[in-house]
Swiss-Prot record:
Keywords: Cytoplasm, Hydrolase, Metal-binding, Nickel. Transmembrane segments: none annotated. Its cofactor is Ni cation. This is Urease subunit alpha. The modification N6-carboxylysine is found at residue 222. Binds 2 nickel ions per subunit. The lineage of its organism: Bacteria, Pseudomonadati, Pseudomonadota, Betaproteobacteria, Burkholderiales. Pathway: Nitrogen metabolism; urea degradation; CO(2) and NH(3) from urea (urease route): step 1/1. Residues 134-581 form the Urease domain. The active site is at 325 (proton donor). Substrate binds at residue 224.
Length: 581
């Protein structure tokens, strides 16, 4: 039998079981755990497109039509990184969804084929490339529509939050207030190759106006201190959420005017809630909002400007806060408000709480103390910093492999951090039946990366099975690669293909009320569901519940008695090596 060297094989078909890959210029190393393309019984039946390759008529391409089972698109030899594993596989796409993860080819000439390639099948060659699920940013201030293209080009395919544009309320708070604005934003969502959903304003002490917003299609409600996050408003908002199976996101009371963190926790009454920027620099009970990380009903997230803690973090935050919350540096009380939120001790602890899996979600806080295009970059920078400062991260003790074998890779840490911007926000907001992972039946939102550019600059962004964005060269060139290469919208982002390739998430009440027809919407509407039963224990790889202690005088943070502190990073990967600015 003919053989091929491991290096030559990886160069031709991509890495296989036991091969290791470095992610960008970080210190993170992944190792391939399984190879689904070997279901034919071993090596030698791989598929590959190109001159002299195997995906040709009568070889790995069958005669079968779409009706006879051939897929619309096959992504060949992809290195999948997802919360459930790091595997090599072919991926079959059909009707905008993922229909198979396994071995592609021609079942008439090859064994073990579970993805049929036919004359009607397109090929995206992923040999040597990484494929991840599209990212999910759950903390969006919809200040300008250009945010969406910026996020898409970074690998984000789902965005939820609130706003109406550059209105003063939207600059500060993440809500689309009232049924009229919700209708307008849902109509605007039809223009974008992005899964979108909007949260209504949750600050009210009586339920009628909140139900009105949910019935109008808001997928949840947002409580923000700038609108008055009192215990009465919290309780009322959660009452409505419980009745409508929607999520509540909260920005708590920095000034402790209407109560302390203990009062807010009491108002939760054990009900599930998504706490935004749980460290507190983005807002929340000063100085101890981070205590909520240890509560079983709290689904905690971070926003990216504090990720990770660096020598520049503190200096940039005060100015950001003054602008975002309509404060005046000439007013002493406004300045004191800003400075009370920026604490190096809690920001440093936030790094470690992410590494421990105690903070479950990463998000941006776009243009409102956060950078919409940097959710993914800053997640991996945090992972890199934590490996550099805390060493290798051991997987759960149920893993039976020898420690020496496990220490060859960072697979567990990589799965933990990936889950923070994929499956966990999807679970939190009731969308995991559609998005958040590479699994059968889910919407085909996939991001292709060259390993050297992983987390920094994707090669392709696939939305609902169509390529919606890509790093593309000069359109007048004779080939696709000449400079200037930059992100450009592709055919999946135009015309009717745009509407077929993306989802708009709404409440079940709104869907039942027929808002799609009433508002004249063209995108497919999907109702959020199974939200109210979600707890911290359901956060994949990120469900640690420490007993939190925060000293009100020194701001020192302890988790289960351990002092959490680390040095700021002086330099980071995924920065100047990739960007001019």
């Amino acid at each position: 039998m003919a053989t091929i060297g491991r290096r030559a094989y990886a160069e031709m078909f991509g890495p296989t079981v036991g091969d290791r890959v470095r992610l960008a210029d970080t210190n993170l190393i992944i190792e391939v755990e399984d190879d689904y393309t070997l279901r034919a019984g071993g090596y030698g039946e791989e598929v590959k497109f190109g001159g002299g390759k195997t995906i040709r008529d009568g070889m790995a391409q069958s005669q079968r039509s779409r009706a006879e089972g051939a897929v619309d698109t096959v992504m060949t030899n992809a290195l999948i990184i997802d919360h459930w594993g790091i595997v090599k596989a072919d991926i079959g796409l059909k009707d905008s969804r993922i229909v198979a993860i396994g071995k592609a080819g021609n079942p008439d000439t090859q064994p073990g084929v579970d993805i049929i390639i036919g004359p009607g099948t397109e090929v995206i060659s992923c040999e040597g490339s990484i494929v991840t699920a599209g990212g999910f940013d759950s903390h969006i201030h919809f200040i300008c529509p250009q945010l969406i293209e910026e996020a898409l080009s970074s690998g984000i395919t789902t965005m939820t939050g609130g706003g109406t544009g550059p209105a003063t309320g939207t600059f500060a708070t993440t809500c689309t207030p009232g049924s009229w604005h919700i209708e307008r934003m849902l109509q605007a969502a039809d223009a974008f190759a992005m899964n979108l959903g909007f949260m209504g304003k949750g600050n009210a002490s009586l339920p009628a106006a909140l139900h009105e917003q949910i019935n109008a299609g808001a997928l949840g409600l947002k409580l923000h201190e700038d609108w008055g996050t009192t215990p009465a408003a919290i309780d009322n908002c959660l009452n409505v959420a419980e009745l409508t199976d929607t999520q509540v996101a909260i920005h708590t009371d920095t000034l402790n005017e209407s109560g302390f963190v203990e009062d807010t926790l009491a108002a939760f009454k054990g009900r599930s809630i998504h706490t935004f920027h749980t460290e507190g620099a983005g807002g929340g009970h000063a100085p101890d909002i981070m205590k909520l990380v240890g509560e079983p009903n709290v689904l905690p997230s971070s926003t990216n400007p504090t990720r990770p803690y660096t020598v520049n973090t503190l200096d940039e935050h005060v100015d950001m806060l003054m602008v975002c919350h309509h404060l005046d540096a000439a007013i002493a009380e406004d300045l004191a408000f800003a400075e009370s939120r920026i604490r190096k001790e809690t920001i440093a602890a936030e790094d470690i709480l992410h590494d421990l899996g105690a903070i479950s979600i990463m998000s941006s806080d776009s243009q409102a103390m956060g950078r919409v295009g940097e959710v993914i970059i800053r997640t991996w920078q945090t992972a890199h910093k934590m490996k550099a400062q805390r060493g290798w991260l051991a997987p759960p003790p149920e893993r039976s492999e020898p420690v020496e074998k496990l220490q060859r890779n960072d697979n567990y840490r990589v799965k933990r951090y990936l889950a923070k911007y994929t499956i966990n926000p999807a679970l939190t907001h009731g969308m995991a039946h559609e998005v958040g992972s590479i699994e059968l039946g889910k919407w085909a939102d996939l991001v292709v990366w060259r390993p050297a550019f992983f987390g920094v600059k994707p090669s392709l962004i696939v939305k609902g099975g169509s390529i919606a964005m890509a790093a593309m060269g000069d359109p007048n060139a004779s080939i696709p690669t000449p400079q200037p290469v930059h992100y450009r919208p592709m055919f999946g982002a135009f015309g009717g293909a745009l509407a077929r390739g993306s989802l708009t998430f709404v409440s079940q009440a709104g869907l039942n009320a027929g808002i799609g027809a009433r508002y004249g919407l063209s995108k497919t509407l999907s109702a959020v569901k199974n939200i109210r039963g979600i707890r911290k224990e359901h956060m994949v790889h990120n469900h640690y519940l420490p007993k939190m202690e925060i000293d009100a005088q020194t701001y020192s943070v302890r988790a289960d008695g351990e002092l959490l502190t680390c040095e700021p990073a002086v330099s980071l990967p995924m920065t100047q090596r990739y960007f001019l600015f």
